[in-house]
């Protein structure tokens, strides 16, 4: 009898399910000072059709090159904190909706069409100040689009940008095909 109970308890301990705890990390950032935004042409930007030969130059993702498509972001309905006309820092952050940038670059938004053009993505430049045009992302991928603006000028303000296609690896050829990239824009001020 002793042997049967021992054997049954051993069988049950081996076949019973094991439950292990798992952690879930949830992160959020809540701000009082957000704004609504509008993007020209409802955020649809058509870069047109270009030939693969148009990518032969040595234009980097860091350098602004005229000829891209311009678009405007309008900032409105900002919940202004405090009173008076004070200097604010307006942040307009661009990030890939998929979370994936072009391989080897933190400044080039990837082509999301896997069957599409290869070795080409999209870059976005701030052209608000023609004397100071810059890629909205630094070489490390952090946002550079921070603008000083007075409280009185914040609501209904417009900000100019330009976007174009960008060769990713200068040593490789661009291949033909469609290009699509979804970019999320976050706007806040401090």
Can you annotate each of these PLM segments?
Residues 1-20:
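Gram-negative bacterial Sec-dependent N-terminal signal peptides
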Residues 19-190:
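Mature extracellular/passenger domains of Gram-negative fimbrial/pilin and adhesin proteins
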